[in-house]
């Protein structure tokens, strides 16, 4: 039996390269003899060496526990991170017992601070694939008998017999670990017939001194060679040879060598005996990090662990964690070696260790500390305690890993305090999941953040307000400037070409926006300077006219100046000749929108007067109050049109007042600039809508989380329809969509009703959702036609030819899932019907194969709702969206759509 030799700092640290290559054995055969659970680490990789585990191997080999008189080495850490320079596989010449020689070198403190793991360039040890193992019986080891081979094993590993012969027979040549050849006669005979090794077998048994209970292994490798190895049964050695050092000497030697190497960063050599060692004590660093820092365990948690059984097979045994503590808190404090005390379920596991290490077990209940393959995210928030570095400052996974460095030493007084294990070898495990529900964010977090920031802007130093606003709105993306400039081009076309229809003007503006990208880029610095001057000017006017506006525009004056219900809003911009100011206000509209959208202010005339400071009192009042009975949509008479920007406020939010921006000559305003960060979960897609004051499904192109919407309306006294290009939001992309033909789209309050993410038929006022099924074209379904789930399932069965399949999903395997407005994927039928009808976004029909794939955690089966909506609408409205340009692609989202 090979034991660890006495190690010292003066002994040779590694074998010569040529000698090491000569001694290196066949990797497949060596691993087959070592056992199915043994895997040597890759050369030139980083490993964790446990002196405590090395001492266990010595104690198991010598049948003597560690003596308490052995000196302690306080400077030797319980786990030593090393570089593996060399691995050589060996086999004892007499017993064929396998062992490995490893040359390690502890990492320096500078190397331990490296944030990335180096790529493992070495080749992994080759494991056997085509082999069989059999435990010898008494007849197999008798001198007059042969070796009986199981039929399946013989057909799998041995070369095929020629059954035309009688009896079928052949000669086999096998090589052992020492490259010795052994010849056997393979014959198929007996009653019943079986595969036997006859001639040559008894010679092999005698030479190897095999007994019943030992095992033999045959391997057929890729080179069409037959390999032969043996694995001896564990037999306790009662008398140690006198030439072998005592157990205490070996313990002292290995500890002294490791302590000297740790202090001097020098190389040292160890020997690993997989058949004698209770557990591996040289662990790959990636495996160690995953188990210790990315697997949460607690007392009472269930787990399973792999064990080797008869004939080189493995089996999982179940157990329960009963305690988590140090195995030896005096000599090895803060050690992860066998830190988990367990209780085994089966009584037959009496020979199993009562304590195990974290990397040896597989907890049955774990927490999502690294990304899961299952595409569905958690429906309810879970306070995981994950740090929020990189979430709101634009940091990515690398920033997150750099901030959340992994603590690998629980003793704060020793060596390096942390390791940033983020690199090639462990990236699938070490990228934490960034999810707003996991971070415990409440739904109104974004509104609270925006309100707090707005208060600071409103009452803070004016010199600090506008540069930050300008930097966010104008330099975040080129598209922010393109939007405003595009709006100015539209205004110019409307002003100088009054005979064109609104739709033609919008289409021409899109074409020019496509072809004049170079011109727009050249005008962007000029646009930024103009916006800066405009913002500063507005701020000065706000400070000067605050008291004046509060006195002149009281609520009594506003009520007196209200127009009658049969009159329309006058063309204030045309009468006052304020086209330049209105156009400038459009260019700087993003600051107006961002400021007035979120803040709750008790004096709405103040902000309107700041933006349109040259309007008279009556004109400003007309801008604030719109008659409920007026026909606000028009398609002709373009010079007299007015565009109003409203913030439709939920009835339960009395502190939020509608803010209306009025623009002369009525270009289409596409929300210029970049919006402040907000969740993308409330965004929606609108294609068509029709006037219906009682239908709450009419909506805007943007919806915030609290139900507040931002819409574009048009006021005109002549006709009741006009073309408004809609906005589509998908991910971080906001593009114009097909034109919205609308009439009387306002509710009784003068604003659009909240969006429910459902398309509206312009001819019937019916609400539609889209239904998808793999292998079939998508269909649109009027959800208002149904009053129960049974009617919905019957219609889906008829549309997709699935009669009788959707009513009984347990029997048929077909499942119906839907995406709601919160981008959650749920089963159809779990919610009350009315709640389902109000929240459904789209429906997906899953086949039995897709359900199984989903259960197994298949990626991509249910893609993110944002991506799926983008794809589906691009298919349905290709002609409309193909020519449209991205006019607000710089909209930021705090939480991503994809989970």
UniProtKB/Swiss-Prot annotation:
Keyword Cell inner membrane listed: no
DNA-binding residue intervals: 132-234
Ranges where the PB1 domain occurs: 766-850
Biased composition (Low complexity): 546-564
InterPro entries, sorted: ARF_dom, ARF_plant, B3_DNA-bd, DNA-bd_pseudobarrel_sf, PB1-like
GO biological process: auxin-activated signaling pathway; regulation of DNA-templated transcription
GO cellular component: nucleus
Keywords, ordered alphabetically: Auxin signaling pathway, DNA-binding, Nucleus, Transcription, Transcription regulation
Known tissue expression: Expressed in roots, culms, leaves and young panicles.
Location of this chain's protein in the cell: Nucleus
KW Transcription (keyword) present: yes
Domain of life: Eukaryota
GO molecular function, one term: DNA binding
Residue ranges, compositional bias (Polar residues): 575-586
Region called Disordered, residue ranges: 1-20, 546-586
Quaternary state and interactors: Homodimers and heterodimers.
Domain notes: Interactions between auxin response factors (ARFs) and Aux/IAA proteins occur through their C-terminal dimerization domains III and IV.
Name used for this protein in its record: Auxin response factor 25
Organism: Oryza sativa subsp. japonica (Rice)
């Amino acid at each position: 039996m090979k034991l660890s030799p006495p190690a010292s700092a003066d002994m040779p640290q590694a074998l010569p390269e040529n000698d090491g290559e000569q001694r290196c054995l066949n990797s497949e055969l060596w691993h087959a003899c070592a056992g199915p659970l043994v895997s040597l680490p890759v050369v030139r990789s980083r490993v964790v060496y446990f002196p405590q585990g090395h001492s266990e191997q010595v104690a198991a080999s010598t049948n003597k526990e560690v003596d308490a008189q052995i000196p302690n080495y306080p400077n030797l850490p319980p786990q030593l991170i090393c570089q593996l320079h060399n691995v050589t596989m060996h086999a004892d010449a007499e017993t064929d017992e396998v062992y490995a020689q490893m040359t390690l070198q502890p990492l320096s403190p500078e190397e331990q601070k490296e944030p990335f793991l180096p790529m493992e360039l070495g080749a992994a040890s080759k494991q056997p694939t085509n082999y069989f193992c059999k435990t010898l019986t008494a007849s197999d080891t008798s001198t007059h008998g042969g070796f009986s081979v199981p039929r399946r094993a013989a057909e799998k590993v041995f070369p095929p017999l020629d059954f035309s012969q009688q009896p079928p027979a052949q000669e086999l040549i096998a090589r052992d670990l020492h490259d010795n050849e052994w010849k056997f006669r393979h014959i198929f005979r007996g009653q019943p017939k079986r595969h036997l090794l006859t001639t040559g077998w008894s010679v092999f048994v005698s030479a190897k001194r095999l007994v019943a209970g030992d095992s033999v292994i045959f391997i057929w490798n890729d080179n069409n060679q037959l390999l032969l190895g043996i694995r001896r049964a564990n037999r306790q050695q009662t008398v140690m040879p006198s030439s072998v050092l005592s157990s205490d000497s070996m313990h002292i030697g290995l500890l002294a060598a490791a302590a000297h190497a740790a202090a001097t960063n020098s190389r040292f050599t160890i020997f690993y005996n997989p058949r004698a060692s209770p557990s591996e004590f040289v662990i790959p660093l990636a495996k160690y990090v995953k188990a210790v820092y990315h697997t949460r365990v607690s007392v009472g948690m269930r787990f399973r662990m792999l064990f080797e059984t008869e004939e080189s097979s493995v089996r999982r045994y179940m157990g329960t964690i009963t305690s988590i503590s140090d195995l030896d808190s005096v000599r090895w404090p803060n050690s992860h070696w066998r830190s988990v005390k367990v209780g085994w379920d089966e009584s037959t596991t009496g020979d199993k260790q009562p304590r195990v290490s974290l990397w040896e077990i597989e907890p049955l209940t774990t927490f999502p500390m690294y990304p899961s393959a299952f595409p569905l995210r958690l429906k309810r928030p879970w306070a995981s305690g994950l740090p929020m570095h990189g979430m709101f400052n634009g940091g990515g996974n690398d920033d997150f890993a750099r901030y959340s460095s992994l603590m690998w030493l629980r003793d704060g007084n020793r060596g390096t305090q942390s390791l940033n294990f983020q690199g090639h070898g462990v990236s699938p495990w070490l990228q934490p999941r960034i999810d707003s529900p996991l971070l415990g964010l409440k739904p109104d977090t974004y509104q609270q953040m925006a309100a707090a920031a707005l208060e600071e802007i409103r009452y803070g130093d004016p010199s600090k307000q506008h540069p930050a606003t300008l930097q966010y709105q104008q330099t975040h993306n080129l598209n922010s400037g393109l939007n405003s400039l595009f709006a100015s081009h539209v205004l110019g076309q409307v002003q100088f070409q009054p005979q064109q229809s609104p739709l033609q003007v919008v289409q021409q503006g899109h074409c020019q926006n496509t072809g004049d990208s170079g011109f727009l880029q050249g005008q962007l610095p000029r646009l930024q300077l103009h916006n800066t001057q405009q913002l500063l000017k507005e701020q000065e006017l706000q400070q000067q006219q605050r008291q004046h506006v509060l006195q002149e525009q009281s609520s009594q004056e506003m009520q007196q100046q209200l127009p009658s219900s049969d009159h329309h809003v006058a063309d204030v911009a045309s009468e006052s000749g304020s086209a330049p100011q209105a156009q400038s206000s459009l260019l700087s509209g993003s600051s107006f929108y961002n400021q007035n959208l979120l803040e709750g202010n008790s004096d709405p005339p103040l902000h309107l007067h700041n933006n349109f400071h040259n309007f008279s009192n009556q004109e400003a009042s007309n801008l604030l109050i719109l008659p409920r009975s007026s026909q606000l949509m028009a398609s002709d008479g373009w010079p007299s049109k007015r565009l109003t920007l409203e913030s439709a406020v939920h009835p339960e939010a009395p502190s939020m007042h509608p803010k209306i921006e009025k623009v002369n000559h009525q270009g289409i305003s596409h929300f210029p600039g970049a919006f402040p960060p907000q969740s993308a979960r409330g965004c929606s897609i609108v294609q068509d809508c029709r006037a219906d004051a009682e239908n709450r499904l009419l909506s805007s192109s943007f919806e915030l989380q609290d139900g507040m919407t931002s819409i574009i309306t048009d006021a005109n006294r002549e006709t009741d329809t006009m073309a408004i290009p809609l906005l589509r939001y998908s991910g971080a992309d906001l593009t114009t969509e097909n034109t919205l033909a609308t009439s009387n789209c306002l509710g009784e309050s003068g604003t659009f009703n909240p969006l429910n993410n459902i398309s509206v038929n312009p001819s019937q006022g019916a609400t539609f959702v889209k239904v998808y099924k793999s292998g079939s074209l998508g269909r649109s379904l009027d959800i208002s036609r149904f009053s129960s789930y049974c009617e919905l399932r019957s219609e889906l069965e008829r549309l997709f030819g699935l009669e009788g399949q959707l009513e009984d999903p347990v029997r048929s395997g077909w499942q119906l899932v839907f995406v709601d407005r919160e981008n959650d994927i749920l089963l159809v039928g779990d919610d009350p019907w009315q709640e389902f009808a109000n929240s459904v976004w789209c429906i997906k029909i899953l086949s039995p194969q897709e359900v199984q794939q989903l259960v197994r955690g298949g990626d991509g089966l249910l893609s993110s709702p944002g991506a799926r909506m983008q794809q589906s609408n691009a298919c349905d409205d290709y002609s409309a969206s193909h020519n449209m340009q991205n006019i607000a692609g710089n909209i930021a989202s705090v939480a991503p759509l994809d989970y």
